[in-house]
Amino acid sequence: MKTFVAKPHEVTRDWFVIDAKGKVLGRVASEVARRLRGKHKPEFTPHVDTGDYIVIINAADIVVTGKKSQDKKYFRHTTYPGGIRETNFEKMQERFPGRAIQKAVKGMLPKGPLGYAMIKKLKVYAGAEHPHTAQQPKPLDL
């Protein structure tokens, strides 16, 4: 029996919606990264993007355990010399509610062109509304 290798044009992708209200950031991010990569499917192939589309709603209500809301640091650079800036999880959630989950998932995906294509299938929204109802996303419980 020959080993099955998925081809990009043969992959079928589903749409899933995840309600992140009250869920822990890392647990949601690891499951989302797994599904974006396609590891939950029997036809998973490492060099082909076999993952599904994921819509995350209520990203503003995601939580972290312990004192991570003050202790977890996010860094960015302004591209000027000495321009490193840092912020914590709490301030990041106030200013950009979906960015923390997006950065967490992006860090769990492979780096390179394949990983960049995978992260484009993640849609994050701070509130309960999303514009992807036409795709009829299935609810996913974590």
Curated annotation (Swiss-Prot):
The keyword Repeat does not apply. The keyword Glycosyltransferase does not apply. Keywords: Ribonucleoprotein, Ribosomal protein. Pfam families: Ribosomal_L13 (PF00572). CDD domains: Ribosomal_L13. GO terms for cellular component: cytosolic large ribosomal subunit. Belongs to the universal ribosomal protein uL13 family. This protein is one of the early assembly proteins of the 50S ribosomal subunit, although it is not seen to bind rRNA by itself. It is important during the early stages of 50S assembly. This is Large ribosomal subunit protein uL13. It comes from Bordetella avium (strain 197N). The gene is rplM.
